[in-house]
């Protein structure tokens, strides 16, 4: 009986430590996220959910396709940001700076939300663009406009069913 109690206490302690560690990890960038989200007029919670999905709040992470940082910024997105905002040139390693990374990510997300503001589900199509790029997202939007959700169907679920990239479909579904 004593061993069972000790094991139970160890499990409880491990759960408390893991929870506090995850809480700390997920809140330590809230100030940066809040500033950038407000500056670009995007929802704070949407940005946090995107960061969780992209990097699990790990600022130094690098993706297989060369994307980096909390919001997994690509060089192409960073180049577009510098060109369209007049931001001075940057060195690729600067994209690992959480403040710059979140700034560019929020700018890109806002650009996507603006681009798809007239779509049937702007947040969904913005996330699809963020993950898969412009061309596939335009194709999915065309399909969505050609086949509206059936009566009684959840629009988000219907539009996600049109996405033929399984990872992108899961990505957007998890964020929303």
Where would I find each of the regions flagged by the language model?
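Non-catalytic cell-wall polysaccharide-engagement segments
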Residues: 2-11, 24-27, 31, 38-40, ...
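Extracytoplasmic
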Residues: 28, 42-47, 52, 65-68, ...
């Amino acid at each position: 009986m004593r061993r069972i109690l000790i094991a139970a206490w160890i499990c409880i302690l491990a759960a408390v430590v893991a929870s506090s560690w995850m809480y700390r990890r997920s809140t330590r960038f809230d100030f940066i996220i809040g500033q950038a989200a407000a500056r670009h007029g995007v929802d704070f919670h949407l940005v946090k959910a995107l960061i969780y999905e992209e990097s699990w709040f790990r600022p130094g992470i690098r993706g297989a396709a060369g994307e980096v940082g909390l919001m997994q910024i690509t060089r192409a997105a960073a180049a577009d940001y510098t060109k369209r905002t007049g931001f001075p040139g940057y060195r690729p390693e600067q994209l690992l700076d959480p403040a710059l990374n979140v700034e560019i990510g929020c700018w890109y997300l806002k650009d996507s939300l603006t681009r798809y503001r007239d779509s049937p589900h702007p947040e969904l199509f913005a996330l699809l663009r963020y993950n898969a790029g412009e061309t596939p997202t335009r194709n999915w939007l065309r399909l969505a406009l050609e086949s509206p959700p059936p009566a009684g169907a959840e629009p988000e679920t219907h539009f996600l069913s049109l996405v033929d990239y399984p990872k992108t479909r899961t990505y957007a579904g998890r964020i929303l």
